[in-house]
């Protein structure tokens, strides 16, 4: 499906992203976040504006730099109804490679989509973690982006968080650095494969991980809030056998570098197939195999297998537009 110039629901194809470098700092007390990003873009024809998706964000700084080093400052105009931002520049952008820089702020919402807050109760009181749910069109609530599945790009994420918290994203940690005098750390993750925005994920909070097991060359772990690690063994066993089976069945190696399965206390769907960081509702991942019913075990096994099937069919190979989602889900259901 190739959108025409008057299509009100699709982004223009004049500019497309190649690589995002995103730095986000969530504040779990104020329930806000700040962000900066640098996006390598390809300009395909002369334009004076760049149109991308943004929702519930405030864009404070805009600039773009050419391959020769020339920099233009721009202004952002937000279109709330269309969930778009128009970045307007004083001179036309020539065709070629440019680097777009943006600074922005947002809110950790309580609506279980975008970059949101998840709450849970402990003997010490209520706790909060920050999690993401981007399918179908909610990555734009975490950072300005080309939030359509056909606009695949590489993502490199840096999360800034208190040193006592755990941070997880799609790829392994590439570096971790303490920010002197702040009690915070900056964790940078390895670049992803080229993928759609809706498959990016990150979680920040008090988390515990199961002992990793190796499935071929892939480390696999289950993450949960503290005190629930004893409920991860069944899902880990199912995940390991599913991952090994699908690698053999598809005849293609798993496309990620690691596989984390994360149980989120507040989660709208059953699970979400973020590449390398699959998020789940707790009841779809955590189970006491010795006390659970057959139906409960079958439910966990089905959901885990379904999401791992998506790592190839949906993540590695993705529909160009949402009218193809039926095949994405139908094939994963068949492969359960």
Annotate each language-model stretch with its function.
Residues 56-122, 147, 180-181, 188:
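A surface-exposed beta-strand-loop module
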Residues 308-323:
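Catalytic Zn2+-binding segment of zinc metalloproteases
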Residues 1-34, 69, 124-129, 149:
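N-terminal, polar/Ser/Thr-rich
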Residues 5-12, 94, 103-156, 205-214:
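Glycine/proline-rich low-complexity spacer/linker segments in large multi-domain proteins
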Residues 55-58, 117-129, 264-269:
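Short edge-strand/loop segments of extracellular domains
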Residues 33-56:
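Ligand-binding face of N-terminal immunoglobulin V-set domains in extracellular IgSF glycoproteins
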Residues 26-28, 39-45, 106-108, 161-163:
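Beta-strand elements of well-folded, non-transmembrane domains
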Residues 35, 132-137, 144-305, 334:
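Hydrophobic helix-coil surface modules that form long, contiguous segments used
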């Amino acid at each position: 499906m190739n959108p025409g110039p008057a299509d009100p629901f699709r982004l223009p194809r004049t500019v497309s992203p190649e690589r995002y470098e995103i730095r986000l700092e969530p504040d779990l007390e104020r329930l806000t976040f700040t962000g900066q990003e640098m996006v390598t873009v390809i300009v395909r024809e002369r334009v004076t504006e760049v149109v991308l998706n943004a929702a519930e964000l405030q864009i404070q700084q805009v600039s773009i730099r050419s391959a020769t080093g020339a920099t233009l400052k721009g202004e952002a105009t937000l279109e709330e109804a269309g969930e778009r931002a128009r970045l307007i520049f004083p001179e036309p952008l020539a065709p070629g490679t440019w680097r777009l820089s943006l600074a922005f702020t947002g809110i950790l919402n309580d609506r279980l989509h975008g970059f949101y807050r998840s709450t849970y109760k402990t003997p010490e009181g209520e706790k909060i973690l920050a999690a993401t749910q981007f399918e179908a069109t909610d990555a734009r609530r975490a950072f300005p982006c080309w939030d359509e599945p056909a606009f695949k790009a590489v993502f490199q994420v840096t999360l800034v968080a208190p040193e006592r918290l755990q941070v997880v994203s799609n790829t392994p940690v590439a570096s971790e650095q303490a920010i002197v005098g702040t009690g915070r750390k900056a964790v940078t993750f390895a670049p992803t494969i080229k993928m759609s925005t809706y498959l990016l994920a990150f979680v920040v909070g008090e988390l515990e991980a199961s002992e990793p097991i190796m499935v071929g060359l892939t480390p696999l772990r289950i993450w949960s809030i503290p005190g629930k690690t004893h409920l991860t063994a069944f899902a880990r066993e199912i995940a390991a056998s599913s991952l090994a089976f699908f690698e053999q069945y598809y005849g293609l190696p798993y496309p990620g570098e690691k596989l984390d399965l994360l149980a989120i206390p507040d989660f709208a769907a059953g699970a979400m197939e973020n590449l390398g960081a699959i998020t789940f509702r707790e009841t779809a991942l955590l189970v006491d195999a010795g006390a659970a019913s057959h139906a409960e075990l079958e439910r966990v096994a089905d959901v885990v297998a379904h999401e791992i099937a998506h790592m190839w069919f949906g993540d590695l190979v993705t529909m160009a537009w949402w009218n193809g989602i039926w095949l994405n889900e139908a094939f994963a259901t068949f492969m359960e």
